[in-house]
């Protein structure tokens, strides 16, 4: 009665709030925990829609401080934006109000007839089995028709990359013999047969040779910036080996080897010193440096409608640490080198699949294709998806092809959980949060898109 009295003064309230509260408070007795949770979600949605309908349009509680729609306005309002933390909190709070312990109810005063648990469980299991089989039947055709790259296209793109790599290697040896470099080599998902949809990008690693006694790497978490997964490369022993003792002293900024300055050095070589049109005519390609901001990227047209982008990526190795000049998303960290984990991640994934003929790589490629084809999921990277699969591989042992649908759904749920926490630890280096460079708004949008797909995951395969 107290609840009803409090709601009495609400504008135009006809008692629906009291009815909803009564339904929610007794749902546990009739439906059980799972049914009560689902009823809670549905009832909360109806209740909010009703409240929104009877509230004044200018009500300040309907908009966030920024004026944007928030989690209080779900997807039926036509907003593609992700649910924010306010609605997550509201939804969690609403579900938490549902009783979950049978001891909380007085069974002497209210003993409704219990449904047959065995029959109900059997119906639920049958429905889940049918949904899983339906999804399983759709995942493999999606991979064949949408994700997999035709073998011919993949071979031609690889050959174009090999030709460009050979030309650059010859140029560097002939024109820049004093530059201490190891041989350049190809890397990336195309090279590792993990690229999807179209063969359109590959990395060309340019390894710098650094004197081990003149340089050291400092983990980002040990600096004032506190950025795990990144390193500073410090110039050592300047009192014994003055500036100029190392070729790469010319790229030192503030006592540290600057990846940006190194990249600028190679940009002059890639864009200014090499006659790419002449090389392209010799190889029967159209080659040109990509426009800014892709300063260290070549665009190669190897067929009339086929383009390959080759990223030049300077790299340094100090001890067991391999770093690449791939900048942090925030400009304030442009003096940091990124820890290279991709080769080790790919090797672990391949080794796991080879050991049991599993479908981990297949599941990863389907997820990558979905993200590449869905603009709302475009901020998810191959590294993040790979680590979701690696974490799941530690929890689940059976990765036979028949389990593809189950593992796919588990990967989606796991990804949503990581997004909700805002943390995706690297499977190889747990100190590294792979979501650290995403903004809260991007995390919300990604989480909402995936959250909405859980009820009907086939929608993701239709993009």
From Swiss-Prot:
Compartments where found: Mitochondrion outer membrane
Annotated Pfam families: Mab-21_C (PF20266), MID51-like_C (PF21297)
Cystine residue pairs: none
Chain segments carrying region Dimerization: 49-195
One GO term (biological process): mitochondrial fission
Job description of the protein: Mitochondrial outer membrane protein which regulates mitochondrial fission/fusion dynamics. Promotes the recruitment and association of the fission mediator dynamin-related protein 1 (DNM1L) to the mitochondrial surface independently of the mitochondrial fission FIS1 and MFF proteins. Regulates DNM1L GTPase activity and DNM1L oligomerization. Binds ADP and can also bind GDP, although with lower affinity. Does not bind CDP, UDP, ATP, AMP or GTP. Inhibits DNM1L GTPase activity in the absence of bound ADP.
Similarity-based family: Belongs to the MID49/MID51 family.
Record PANTHER family: MITOCHONDRIAL DYNAMICS PROTEIN MIEF1, MITOCHONDRIAL DYNAMICS PROTEINS 49/51 FAMILY MEMBER
Protein name in UniProt: Mitochondrial dynamics protein MID51
